[in-house]
Amino acid sequence: MILELDCGNSFIKWRVLRAEAGALIAEGVVDSDGALVDNLRSLEKVSLVKCRLVSVRTEDETNLLIGLLKQEFGISVVCAAPAREMSGVKNGYDDYERLGLDRWLAMLGGFHLAKGACLVLDFGTAVTADFISADGEHLGGFICPGMPLMRNQLRTHTRKIRYGDLAAERALTSQAPGRNTVEAVERGCSLMLRGFVLTQLEMARSYWGDDYRVFITGGDAELVSDVAPEARVVSDLVFVGLAMACPLS
């Protein structure tokens, strides 16, 4: 069985696949290496053989996790690496190694699914947008703070803004002007993300008219999915690209 990991800034997304058919056996999201090991050990009748992962962590943090996986499960680990070109997609950064690996894999996955021009929007700790033309040319992209960063900055630097995650979730049941601080903050941040999406769609149309696909991924994808009804929400888009970048026989 194959373990796949997407090690982000705040969480580790994991899933276990059956090696022969690629069928999904189990999946989850954890906030630490220890929690990952606990989750995997709790699975019944699961025998891990190989692992492929993508990480935006520091090299030391990634190596610690790899060492832990080898120690606990005795499996080989393959890491996604930067590339100038792969699977028909040409990296658009001047220094290709500086492009975040999660963005790169999401682009590979999006282009593979689109079979043509596409806009890839990822809503995690940070929000990213990337434009890939029909011939696979990465035209560049944008990065801005995601919902967690905007929320935490306001909580940290504004003394009177204090509320919990449950209050934040309740506040997002509407987009009407807030009648209290939590509603005002959460809905204001949400509207910023929605405005970001609309700007990206406008730019994509200026490039390709209506001849392109839109993919939305990331933990907060559902907050903006209604802004782009034509978009396809693909929660595992990074994993689609990971399988392309790190094929395991």
UniProtKB/Swiss-Prot annotation:
Binding site for substrate: Y93, G100, L101, D102, R103, T181
Compartments in which it is found: Cytoplasm
Family: Belongs to the type III pantothenate kinase family.
One GO term of the biological process aspect: coenzyme A biosynthetic process
Entry annotated with the keyword Lipoprotein: no
Residues that hold ATP according to the record: D6, C7, G8, N9, S10, F11, I12, K13, T125
Organism phylogeny: Bacteria, Pseudomonadati, Pseudomonadota, Gammaproteobacteria, Pseudomonadales
Catalytic activity, as annotated: (R)-pantothenate + ATP = (R)-4'-phosphopantothenate + ADP + H(+)
Pfam name, any one: Pan_kinase
Active site positions, chain numbering: D102
Ranges that cross the membrane: none
Function recorded in the entry: Catalyzes the phosphorylation of pantothenate (Pan), the first step in CoA biosynthesis.
InterPro entries noted in UniProt: ATPase_NBD, Type_III_PanK
UniProt binding sites for K(+): D122
GO terms under cellular component: cytoplasm
Gene3D superfamilies, A to Z: 3.30.420.40
Cofactor: how bound: A monovalent cation. Ammonium or potassium.
Name of the protein in its database record: Type III pantothenate kinase
